[in-house]
Amino acid sequence: PHFAQSFVRAYKLAMTPPHEPVMIALDAELQESTTHERAKLAIPRYVPTSPPQGDANAVREAARLLANAERPVIVADKCARTAGGVKLLVELAEALQAPVIDQKGRMNFPNTHHLSQNARGRALIGQADVIIGLELSDYWATVNGHIDNGEDDGAGLNESHIKPDAKLISISSILLNTKSNYQDFQRFQVVDVEMAADAEATLPALIEAVRQALPAGRKAAIEARGQAVKKAWSEARERTRVAASYAWDARPISTARMAMEVYAQIKDLDWSSVGGDRQLSAWPTRLWPMDKHYHHIGGPGGYGVGYGLPAAVGAALANRDAGRFSVNFQPDGDLMFSPGVLWTAARHKIPLLSVMHNNRGYHQETMHVQRMSNRRNRVAFVGKDLGPLGTRIENPDIDYAKLASSMGAYSAGPITDPKDLAPALKKAVEAVKAGEPALVDVVTQPR
């Protein structure tokens, strides 16, 4: 009976914001012992826990600050848990005509909406007089920066990105996730209004409070703010389009070309991007129209190597039951930490298209080694064959298509000519639609 109780309790914890994994440890003796009085065994009834909502007084104060702000900014990281959460965030932004910076811990805000302002994030933070952070993983890093320049005895320098009199509001359930040892708090950031609550659950009350607090005489100013933001959104979209066109026919293949070739094959499907895209300059979230909460599941909670494909396979399993097409851009070094998950996907017939971002290196580390070498006036590259030691995956080059094939997945590549992308991807998409995992190995630019 204790196991059943623990399992239901663990499930309740995992499904209550902030949603995080729960581990159950079963003693070996318990697993091997004979069960007595089987008739008395029972599984407790599961009743979902209502997510915590923000205090009414704090909600009103936050609404007052936002309604009277000249330059309010909304920053969301893991705010929208559901389709309803995306809709609520749009309502709040439209009520204020406030720009939204989506940090993409989840798909919080449609990038097709003119209030989506990721491209201007740093500038908007610096201009804001009121900033509201919704489920931010790292509020300090949102409003501050670190200059890794070797000053201060090698520690670097910290700098604030906000005005001295800017007001900060936080709604986050992470404050309720205090653990016995390791924490997820990041650096401490002083804020003016702080609510230990689930942001999505608090948004309806906040939206209503904002509407009541908006001064009648500010309607024209708010509309003008929205028009200015819309103009900036259009200009940013055009800059992104132009930037994506650079090196379109280059070899190795540009990551923007790869992203758009994939989109051309899946745009008419009910698709879901189930991997992070930071390593390929975030082209999918910058170029693909994303307006559904499952269009992007968000990136990892940290920077752990080996996260990508296991997370993508798990999301693809959930999407299989929903009838969605799952696609994952898979970094090469990341895959080598857990290649066996390809077998898992093939064994359980989990439909997933994985497109390799094969830059033949741990490029995050390559850039860091180069930066440190510059600082210390050292050579970062050691000969033609060795290159930057410990950061390249070449000599020999890994054939990821053969690796995937050996695990039972459909595969194609390595592809080095961008003209070969479309036909290879088309066949891979058909394999995934037939219910199997597929991997296309694409040799790419570093970012």
Predicted regions and their residues:
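Conformationally flexible catalytic loops at phosphate/diphosphate-handling active centers
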Residues: 9, 13-68, 242
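Glycine-rich, acidic loop regions that bind phosphate or pyrophosphate groups
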Residues: 1-5, 102-230, 425-428
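Conserved thiamine diphosphate
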Residues: 1-32, 107, 125, 133, ...
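Glycine-rich phosphate/diphosphate-binding loops that line cofactor/substrate pockets in enzymes
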Residues: 12-18, 58-73, 92-95, 125, ...
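Active-site diphosphate/adenylate-binding microenvironment
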Residues: 229-318
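Glycine/aspartate-rich loop-and-adjacent alpha/beta segment that forms the canonical ThDP
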Residues: 30-53, 138-147, 151-155, 402, ...
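Gly-rich Lys/Arg/Thr-decorated short loops/hinges at beta-loop-alpha junctions or inter-strand turns
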Residues: 34-47, 234-246, 292-295, 380-385, ...
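Thiamine diphosphate
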Residues: 122-127, 203, 282-446
